[in-house]
């Protein structure tokens, strides 16, 4: 700050600032809140200005969010929103395996399954979390350090920007595990990648690569994260060296198969994961954002968020009601199957068995649910 501006601040700034946070600053297990010095485009620290890093910290469960973590995220985004010295928010997670895989399946299966009135209250918190991200007074950058799946994809899409390491996978999981992606995905995906690709992602539940996410427009930038013999290389499990196959179909960003996949896996074993380029890209984006008029930037991202907000606000309450009632049958079954299954039995029910039973008019009963669990005979 130059001397003239500094003198004006000393003469005119309030001696005591009002605290606009809802509650005093707290630390929630599973959510990290860290203020890091902001840097300009030259890489120099800007005294008195910061970027907040809000990180999910549950790596043993792929950074899935518990109920307490959801509450912590709401408060964290509120605190960052109110912080006068904060320029941007970086939303990320601990480790290099997962940004977030959605709600905590153990909690879903063992507490919320069969408890629609409880899950309805949980969904109030979930909705408030998504709204806190969409309503943050600072630009929000999703730093994708690993897989962004299910509810993790939904909260990630609520951010303004996505920067990802290229080993990360993206996608939805709802219909495979007893739910529907109506916690934001069905609102955001058609806007971001088009109706057809949104239908593919939201119903088939097939993950796609960071390279494909970048091509589809759900991710603004990707960076390599795998080092082999000290050199960064592109994700060896994904086609990155050509755009079309012999029939003119786009294959860039698609997963490799056959011998190519086997060779890619061998290359993966030789490498090590290094997220330094991801951090560099995120810091550079933060520096670009700080090099703008603050209110003009705020107005710009508030306006550009409107398509997401319009869809989200139109649907979130009836989505909450349906998800609560769904805990009585399909969600109760799917989340239990995932929680109780293992590598040997699998973590999904036999879907055709359920469909055949329902086709015969079988009502939902506890016995039916038990018969569908992985390993049941």
From Swiss-Prot:
The protein's annotated pathway: Aromatic compound metabolism; benzoyl-CoA degradation
The UniProt record lists the keyword DNA-binding: no
SUPFAM superfamilies (UniProt xref): ClpP/crotonase
InterPro entries: ClpP/crotonase-like_dom_sf (IPR029045), Dearomat_hydrolase (IPR017613), Enoyl-CoA_hydra/iso (IPR001753)
Catalyzed reactions per annotation: 6-oxocyclohex-1-ene-1-carbonyl-CoA + 2 H2O = 3-hydroxy-6-carboxyhexanoyl-CoA + H(+)
Protein EC: 3.7.1.21
Main EC class the enzyme belongs to: hydrolase
Gene3D superfamilies from the UniProt entry: 2-enoyl-CoA Hydratase, Chain A, domain 1 (3.90.226.10)
GO terms classed as biological process: benzoyl-CoA catabolic process; menaquinone biosynthetic process
CDD domains named in the record: crotonase-like
GO molecular function: 1,4-dihydroxy-2-naphthoyl-CoA synthase activity; 6-hydroxycyclohex-1-ene-1-carboxyl-CoA hydratase activity; hydrolase activity, acting on acid carbon-carbon bonds, in ketonic substances
Origin superkingdom: Bacteria
Record GO cellular component, one term: cytosol
Keywords assigned: Hydrolase
Family the UniProt entry places it in: Belongs to the enoyl-CoA hydratase/isomerase family.
Record's function text: Involved in the central benzoyl-CoA catabolism. Catalyzes the addition of one molecule of water to the double bond and the hydrolytic cleavage of C-C bond in the alicyclic ring, 6-oxocyclohex-1-ene-1-carbonyl-CoA (6-OCH-CoA) to yield 3-hydroxypimelyl-CoA.
Subunit annotation: Homotetramer.
UniProt protein name: 6-oxocyclohex-1-ene-1-carbonyl-CoA hydrolase
Taxonomic classification: Bacteria, Pseudomonadati, Pseudomonadota, Betaproteobacteria, Rhodocyclales
Gene name of the record: oah
């Amino acid at each position: 700050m130059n001397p003239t501006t500094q003198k004006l601040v000393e003469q005119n700034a309030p001696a005591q600032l009002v605290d606009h946070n809802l509650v005093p600053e707290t630390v929630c297990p599973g959510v990290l809140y860290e203020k890091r010095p902001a840097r300009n485009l030259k890489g120099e620290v800007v005294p008195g200005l910061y970027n907040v890093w809000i990180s999910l910290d549950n790596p043993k469960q792929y950074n899935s969010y518990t109920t307490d973590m959801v509450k912590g995220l709401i408060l964290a985004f509120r605190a960052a929103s109110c912080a006068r010295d904060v320029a941007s928010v970086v939303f990320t997670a601990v480790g290099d395996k997962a940004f977030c895989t959605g709600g905590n399946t153990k909690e879903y299966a063992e507490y919320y399954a069969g408890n629609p009135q409880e899950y309805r209250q949980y969904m109030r918190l979930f909705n408030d979390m998504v709204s806190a991200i969409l309503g943050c007074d600072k630009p929000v950058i999703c730093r994708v350090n690993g897989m962004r799946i299910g509810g993790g994809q939904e909260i990630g899409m609520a951010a303004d920007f996505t920067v990802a390491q290229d080993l990360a996978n993206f996608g939805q999981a709802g219909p495979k595990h007893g739910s529907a992606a109506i916690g934001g995905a069905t609102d955001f995906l058609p806007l971001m990648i088009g109706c057809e690709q949104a239908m593919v992602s939201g119903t088939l539940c097939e993950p796609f690569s960071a390279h494909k996410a970048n091509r589809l427009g759900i991710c603004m930038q990707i960076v390599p994260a795998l080092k082999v013999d000290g050199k960064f290389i592109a994700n060896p499990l994904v086609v990155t060296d050509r755009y079309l196959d012999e029939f003119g179909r786009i294959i860039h960003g698609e997963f490799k198969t056959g011998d190519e996949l086997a060779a890619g896996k061998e290359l993966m074993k030789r490498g090590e994961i290094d997220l330094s380029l991801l951090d560099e890209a995120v810091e550079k984006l933060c520096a670009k954002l700080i090099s703008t008029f603050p209110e003009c930037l705020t107005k710009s991202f508030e306006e550009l968020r409107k398509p997401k907000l319009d869809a989200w606000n139109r649907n979130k309450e009836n989505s909450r009601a349906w998800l609560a009632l769904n805990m009585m049958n399909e969600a109760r079954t799917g989340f239990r199957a995932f929680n109780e299954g293992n590598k040997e039995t699998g973590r999904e029910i036999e879907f055709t068995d359920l469909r055949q039973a329902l086709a015969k008019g079988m009502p939902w009963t506890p016995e039916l649910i038990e018969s569908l669990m992985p390993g049941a005979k």
